[in-house]
């Protein structure tokens, strides 16, 4: 049963990485993609001169 429990813990680690659950130290407990920590999230860039707000 010990091996089975270990497998479950490993699986939970993969599903919920600490970086995502803690948002890299900001607002712990909230879910956010890890790319926000390194500023690598792909943002939709609005074309300059146009206002689509």
Swiss-Prot record:
Q: Which residues form a coiled coil?
A: none
* UniProt-annotated location(s): Secreted
Q: Which positions carry 4-hydroxyproline?
A: 28, 33, 48
- Principal place where this protein is found? secreted
- List keywords of the entry alphabetically: Amidation, Disulfide bond, Gamma-carboxyglutamic acid, Glycoprotein, Hydroxylation, Ion channel impairing toxin, Neurotoxin, Pyrrolidone carboxylic acid, Secreted, Toxin
Role of this protein = Probable neurotoxin with ion channel inhibitor activity.
What's written under domain?
The cysteine framework is IV (CC-C-C-C-C).
Name assigned to this protein: Conotoxin Ac4.3b
According to its UniProt entry, this protein's organism is Conus achatinus (Little frog cone)
